[in-house]
Amino acid sequence: MIEVRGLTMRYGRTVAVDDLTFTVKPGLVTGFLGPNGAGKSTTMRAVLGLEIPAAGEALVDGHAYASLRRPMRTMGALLDAGAVHGGRTARAHLGCLARSNGIDSRRVAAVLDQVGLAEVADRRIGGFSLGMKQRLGIAAALLGDPAVLMFDEPLNGLDPEGIRWIRDLLRSLAGEGRTVLLSSHLMNELALTAEHVVVIGRGRLIADTPTGALAAQFQRDVLVRSADPERLAEILRAHGVSVAPEDASDTGMHGTGMHGTGGLFVRGMDAAEIGELALRAGIALRELTPRSASLEEAFMELTEDSVEYGAGPAARSAAVSEVAR
């Protein structure tokens, strides 16, 4: 596991990480989220022993990473894909890492093949694209066949095929029982990849929860379609709930309101209660769908007061409208 306990990081008067505590467990891909300046990269550097905490600790399998004799066999990490010697070949770069950690040289060829760089293994890294460097960084993280893996923005520079590849790779690694921590600003990808999320803002923990549960906290409404929407709307309003007709902009259908789609957006009553009410009234339902926020929307709401540089109200309102479409 990765354990962060009461971690505090200070730079002069600035508190970058503030008494942060969370655990990254094996068998899951855990997303590590936060706005720019939230302290994500600082926390990951502390896990690797690259930053000295003012208080608290960050442990890998119960030990400080710097105390491990062969650290790459315990934990693999990618923080900066560009932090490589451009004059070396991919094979030579991984070979040096392997020798430094007592790793069999045969692993070099294996991980180069695994990340799709076997054909360019003897090319100098300085000529690699960002996506190729990301793949090389991932190969380095996998080199020691570690049980714990940590990646900071590994999707940067990858094309759609590469993004799908790493999504499948991370899931398969977690499926083998490994611990996987993934930091990324690509919310749609995290929603598809991460089963658990840790959200921080201004260095403090905001949420530590399953991905689905986070979105469910921000349930917007229930979409209801029935054969008699006007009567159902009247009954629902009589029970004190908010009812709005579904218009064409929400469905892509022609026509508006209840006459156009038969859809209602209901707030203040859950799906089960709406279904029971419709049953008692003898109204057949065609659809009953709770609509929760996306991971991106939930993240924006959670971190609204934690952003380092925020847009003005007008721009923020426009951005939220775009997300909701």
Predicted feature locations:
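Hydrophobic C-terminal alpha-helix "anchor/cap" residues
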Residues: 142, 236-237, 278
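ABC transporter nucleotide-binding domain
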Residues: 166-266
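Short, flexible cytosolic linker that couples an ABC transmembrane/permease module to its adjacent nucleotide-binding
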Residues: 110, 212-216, 312-314
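ABC transporter nucleotide-binding domains
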Residues: 2-4, 9-201, 207
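Conserved NTP-handling cores and scaffolds of large molecular machines
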Residues: 101, 177, 240, 292, ...
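C-terminal coupling/interaction segments
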Residues: 267-325
